[in-house]
């Protein structure tokens, strides 16, 4: 090791790092390797290891960089490294302090032990007592008086036997409580994981064992509004119906009569039970001579046929095909004989099919016997009779089946042939679609029969399940002639529960794919599996909270879809946390684990909380809905997301710490390639290497895309993006709000869609019910809407609105009184006024029950008072009657009504309701309205508003006993539609408000929050507009997904907004580039995983899965595009700068993540040292002037007008100015002048002051490459005192023998270097440098803000006094620096000054493999460089270095002693390999590096950061660093 001991000197460590004394001006006292090692405490010493190539890892792990493979390393085996190096003289300082490394003597031990396994500290161990802590990479076991530079750095360790894994042995220490939560995670990760696991297991057991398991047998349960005005009335009315009967709360009859008639009259004649019993006990009208057993009806199973080729079904092959399908698919099933209706024990009834009707009309024995003539004859018959059917004269009972002739009393105007067997009516009514014989098509030669129905003589219901599963589920539904497109077996909801569980395989597939993506991204199967376990556990714990803690008894099937959403969100959080962990590890590699955890959680916990809270809030916002299932789903999903967040800040950090400490590189394939070099070339090894190569190539391409290409695309075309996305937003708003609009559901609740639209069950309900006349009539489309007015019962829903089975109890109105004369007169007048309204429908039939007071008054007037038995209920009394007369006579009138008319009163019959004391407690009036029942929302809305407003106005004048009346009708579906439309808008608005609030609280910036909300609004409009175009209707599932859109779309905008605020750059463009490069890849991965999770849902049969999958794919693509292009472009054009839009807050209230950014103004940002403290950003770029705003790293790619000189001069201006201003003083080089670029010719004087204000305390330094060449000159090593004339000393320290030979080339010692995709060259001359090393431990993505890119701080300055050259590696080309670069140097006007100058090109050394003739290739023209006198910006000062020579040229063959020998290679990016102009010679590459921090902040371990590969096979032998 070489160490300086001056205040303004630097220390060159064996890991290539430089520890300047700028941060700590205390002098550096001499120390050798042993001394440094002795300073390590036992705790520090036991927790570290050294890797095979000299990089130490923390926490007991070995991490090494990728080295060349066997065929790429140097062919000759190098001698043992650790021996005394007699030529190595340590550097000295201009001060008189003792040297750190005395000159080696004969008895001195080896410079570096071959198996240097001395552990180094995880903490910042000071090498010398009076020097600031540095990152000590290697410490030999023996004293190291000198450092041997005879051997290239990688091979120095490469050939040494190294123990691959060293267990982490912690010394025993007394127990002490952790000081913080981060310390708890870092020191006790197993305890944290154990506690979390125990809690999860307990929750799982209690959640499963205590409450009943959910029942999904009725998928429609909970799909009803609760708490709305209509909903409360409907619930009350249903409760009233259920509580009306014998010994119930209410009764239609007085109690003394009810007891006698209870057994025969207590059943509801219209109840489902009655209907089912009637259905079971039906007497089949079997006649010996009849062909069919019965009339087809709704209770039979049926299927719908259509032609496979699109032709008409009215042809002989199609008709026979339908018969064959019936026989082969239904009647041949083993269970059919047990299910079918029979005329005799021997055979089942025939099916009602078109072929059988044609057979009976033409006296054929069966469908198979009919011929073409029969088909034509039947068609002619239908043409003749269709008009009679259409005008209503041909009815269902025109044929007398008993007499086998036409009924003489009916259908007198219908020809006999049209009534035969009622066949024509049944064909037109049941078997063919309604468009078959319309007047328009009656004249066609062959009317088009598109659809035909087939009725099977089996009742629909559960009994048909096996027939469907065996013969229909997996059949393609076609025999080549006809196709079954619709099925109605009555098993849709029963089958749904089975499919709901079966289709969970698709979320499982999605989880597996997301696992693979996460594994590739995190490079850790352990972290991936633990993350997925946390996601599953979130659902388990959420179920426990939902059922046990929150006491939710109802668990709708929609809750299962939360798994899909959580998989995407959980993966997002894992990506964010792992990303921030890696940044933190790189930012502060020498930090303790607890500090790393603390910094990671400081940002990641905040970022994850914002996204989790906004998404959870969007789910919780659904609680404002009135629909039970939506409310329950919102609570469950929101709770699951919050539980997932808690696990992500407890479980996942502990998992990462555990992985870092014990599990890193535990599997062979996950080791780095250099660890496998000496293994046998097994198939497993080769496969792993290939896998690494592929992953590396992909990740490198993605890194370049997100850090360079994407910012370039976003910024350069920002106005185009703004215009395009604004146009999309306007178009989406037009589609959603104006035309075609989001339609409300068009299917009744009983037909609610649960399978995908192409399923035959759904097609029957959605399409074919409307096409057959019997369904249209049965469906109730011709039924008039009733107007039911109720008094005496309060319209209150006092049940549990979160449990659809809890409807509460009936609440009677204590103020109700109808017996008073005033009430009698008012209610009679009310009935009379209602009959005069336009919405009242007058029927021809006599109405006894609509308005009971009218019937009662008439009955009283007809009673003769001469009969004593009738008194007092007779005509003697005039209306209104006395209260006691009314109460007595109303009971008698009701009993007389049934006795005289036989009219039975049921629970739904209008009239008075009595309690057990025969007191009238309620009254029901019912009238028919002119409005017909429809599913159209507008018509039902008009009906409800008109009737309700009229009744409310009338009730305002009612007497006190009748003032609390209310009206109800068949409004269940209308209420559902109304609740969906209103609730969805309210939930979305609430979600947007919460998102805005959270954004505001997170960023404290109104402008960014506003931009985020605008981006979210655009996302919502485009997404919902797309769903409208896909044919979505706003049903229950759709309402949930759309309201959740806000929560899912806010994530990306939040992440970008937070990153924008955290950006250290003062200008908009820098902030945008920072946010894109810092979180862009994580956001894309998050979108990808959620998109994949949604895509995997698409094959599902259950509609809930497919719709959620469609929605998730749309929302991910659209929200990512809006956040990346629209939101970022808004920030680039009108984004806040400095404190613009910032809410002023006391420092104590500011989030720690923003405290430094808020407190640092653009003017002092460069001086602030707090930027490196925060884990989210590294070195700030320093203040920039406006001229820089349009320049960034891919300028040539973004604009053809941007020339190479402009770009390179811009970059060198910034780089060199930052280097010299911030580091020259530290290195003993006074800053006499500032470097000025050619760019200043066009931009003139703006640049100087701004460009030359680098952050002095950021310790940024330009890192260099040098020519590594063997030096055999004993006098090559001299002590240099760095001062104003350090370059003069350098002239004396180099010999001719150290000059480049034909085999010399620019080499990076461990073969790893970061590359960038652009060609930028910055060269300068400073003090002597030679032995440049890249830290082999570099793992992780690094994105210093300095130049809007991600270069690791891993190239370090080594002022060693010889230039080494390494022999060619393997069969790679020989590189040499051949041509003089004299032309690229400024002609100095005075000997003591020179400036940084850019060649404007990337130099490539080429070598002819045959004659070793060396040439120099150039990528760009270098003619743009001029002398320093005429091209420099007058506004800035010059950066000068004192030289003692006037000759500033470099000889092409030798480095003369009178010449400056430092090549400032400040190269940024990857140089592509090109051939030399005149011969086919391979070109080497000079690798570009950047200015960066001097404190050698290298990662001390690999924190599941993707690995670094350097193989010549990759990217044309490119040297790249993996940062994705």
Curated annotation (Swiss-Prot):
Pfam families: MMPL (PF03176), Sterol-sensing (PF12349)
Cell compartment(s), UniProt: Membrane
Residues of this chain annotated as glycosylated in UniProt: 59, 582
One Gene Ontology term of the molecular function aspect: molecular carrier activity
Keywords: Developmental protein, Glycoprotein, Membrane, Transmembrane, Transmembrane helix
Keyword match Disulfide bond: no
GO cellular component terms, A-Z: basolateral plasma membrane; membrane
Main location: membrane
Domain SSD: 486-658
Membrane association type: Multi-pass membrane protein
Residues passing through the membrane, by range: 190-210, 500-520, 525-545, 549-569, 604-624, 638-658, 719-739, 988-1008, 1010-1030, 1040-1060, 1079-1099, 1107-1127
UniProt-listed Gene3D superfamilies: Multidrug efflux transporter AcrB transmembrane domain
Keyword DNA damage set for record: no
Annotated InterPro entries: Dispatched_Hh_regulator, HMGCR/SNAP/NPC1-like_SSD, MMPL_dom, SSD
Coiled-coil residue windows: none
GO annotation, biological process: determination of left/right symmetry; diaphragm development; dorsal/ventral pattern formation; embryonic pattern specification; patched ligand maturation; peptide transport; protein homotrimerization; regulation of protein secretion
Subunit structure: Interacts with SHH via the cholesterol anchor of the dually lipid-modified SHH (ShhNp).
Family: Belongs to the dispatched family.
Main function: Functions in hedgehog (Hh) signaling. Regulates the release and extracellular accumulation of cholesterol-modified hedgehog proteins and is hence required for effective production of the Hh signal. Synergizes with SCUBE2 to cause an increase in SHH secretion.
Name of the protein in question: Protein dispatched homolog 1
Organism whose genome encodes this protein: Homo sapiens
